A protein has these predicted regions:
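Small-residue hinge/turn detector
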Residues: 77-89
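Glycosyltransferase-associated regions of secretory-pathway enzymes
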Residues: 1-76, 94-271
């Protein structure tokens, strides 16, 4: 393990067991000297050594009924900014591999991804007391009838939702990403922080649309990297079922990184 103690990072897990890709990504931050905390909604059986486990309620109360009606990602979208506000740690998704340490002096850590140019919030640090985090938290805590950026079609989808449903569920059912990249992009534009975004090669060097390359033994994943690259997003929400249920092929990026970090994929496959 690296002897240098770097800035803290943290994430959230909802469930009882990590997949090997999540173990790999968490451990990669530990190995590079980042104090790494995993906030959990329940006890997890296979957290890698070196990761600090804390209850998610250290950051906020958890309404699991809302999660059941939306998704785990909905909760994480609210949680990440509350976590930053409370702890000043860098938020990392559990499928973000640490390629190089996050510089201590970097005050804004976020970037666009894929081919659309919208900001992603899979790896995020923004100032604890800035206008951007204030507007994001205000949005989540005081949900509007419809997000300001919604078009007529999206607004109609909200109106079609049953009125007795929680507003978070109604918005989620109308647009699944309304609490994640859409919200982050919109509010960053309103506050002027959009211009502070890093280029995609820093945090999302491989576009989401090409995520199979991590499992291809002949894929040139590193060909996407630049000298700027700090994090490599593995996009497990888009990983094909075969790769989730089977060990990665020898010489693929996933297999090589597991060997480097000491992770045994066979012990943490999707069942």
């Amino acid at each position: 393990m690296a002897s240098t103690v770097r800035r803290p990072v943290a994430s959230l897990w909802i469930g009882e067991r990590l997949h090997y890709l999540n173990q790999l990504c968490l451990l990669s931050h530990v190995k590079l000297g980042h104090p790494t905390t995993l906030y959990c909604t329940e006890k997890i059986s296979n957290v890698p050594e070196g990761v600090t486990v804390r209850p998610a309620t250290d950051i906020m109360s958890i309404d699991m009924e809302i999660v059941k009606q939306t998704s785990e990602s909905f909760l994480s979208n609210v949680f990440r900014y509350k976590m930053i506000e409370k702890t000043n740690a860098v938020w990392i998704d559990c499928d973000a591999f640490c390629h190089r340490p996050f510089p201590d002096e970097m005050e804004n850590i976020f970037a666009g991804h894929g081919f659309r140019g919208a900001l992603n919030c899979g790896v995020v640090y923004i100032p604890q007391k800035g206008e951007l985090i204030f507007q994001l938290l205000d949005y989540y805590q005081n949900l509007p009838d419809a997000p300001a950026w919604f078009n007529k079609q999206q607004r109609k989808r909200i109106e079609k939702q049953e009125s007795h449903l929680p507003q978070a569920v109604r918005i989620y059912n109308a647009e699944r990403t309304a609490f994640g990249p859409q919200a982050f992009t919109w509010f960053a534009q309103q506050t002027g922080d959009f211009e502070k975004a890093l280029t995609s090669d820093y945090l999302y060097p491989v576009p989401f649309q090409l995520n199979d390359v991590f499992f291809d033994p002949y894929g040139r994943v590193e060909g996407h990297f630049t000298d700027n690259t700090l994090s490599v997003h593995l996009y497990t929400n888009g990983t094909k079922p075969w790769w989730r249920k089977n060990v990665p092929l020898s010489n693929s990026y996933a297999a090589r990184m597991c060997a480097e970090m000491g992770v045994n994929p066979a012990e943490a496959l999707e069942e």
